[in-house]
């Protein structure tokens, strides 16, 4: 669809994340939530003054391990609420925005690195008094999860089936559509088709349209095709979140300079790790999953419960197939 037609059809879209996040600057674990009605984000102050917006779902399950979901590049926590809410039926789930995106704010002068993002995750877990966590890292978030596992201060648990970093025990990890270093990709930061005379709104919409189109594969997009209605829905709500292009560029730079994969050899070989990666992924080449298997030999593939080709999906994996019937069973089975 033409970007100008999107702008016209979405002209009434107004931001609802900005101005809705909490004003507390120290982390306060929220009361138990009804997962179907996620609350507005709270804020957690980092040591350098950055503020990380977060939500906690499924607080009634806080006695068990907490699932921490780590976003990919340019993504905000609302982008995977369709998956987080069902997962919170059986466990506590923590969602957050990386600094500079959505409800989170950086200091403005920090060097954005994968290691810094990993540090933010650990500090948030400490502030929420979490002790045992599972990690679900999607795309760039998978690289952040690897940086946590291979943190210089990480120590194996006595049974060598987990790691402990600064008092946080990581017991299970899902690496979704991710990579071990700067990946092979069809995505380009300047890939959006933006007319020279485009307005600021049109530029933002064109960038969002391009980014979303990369989440799927061409065969499922277009009038009457299965993923078009999902992409349209994401377009309609897409401008509601803060996604500065300069923050996305800084995240891309962080991916490009990350050199931590050789430290994966120190990850305990009995720590359960699952990989999921669709063969139609245009953001992160399918073969990147084989690199994860090479550096983390204990990693095992996780497949949706569907008939036919179980890897016939693109980058935004949980938009493909039904979450409740296809994705929840294997995810819950692995996490439990």
Predicted regions and their residues:
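Flexible "cap/lid" loop of the alpha/beta hydrolase fold
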Residues: 157-203
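Conserved HGGG/HGGXW glycine-rich cap/lid loop of the alpha/beta-hydrolase fold
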Residues: 33, 43-106, 110
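Active-site glycine-rich loops that stabilize anionic/oxyanionic intermediates
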Residues: 72-75, 139, 279
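Active-site loop/oxyanion-hole signature of alpha/beta-hydrolase fold enzymes
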Residues: 95, 100-136, 140, 151, ...
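Conserved alpha/beta-hydrolase catalytic His-Asp/Glu region
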Residues: 184, 205-256, 261-266
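Acidic catalytic loop of the alpha/beta-hydrolase fold
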Residues: 280-284
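Short beta-strand/loop motif that positions the catalytic acidic residue
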Residues: 275-277
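Catalytic active-site module of serine/aspartate enzymes centered on a nucleophile-bearing elbow/loop
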Residues: 298-336
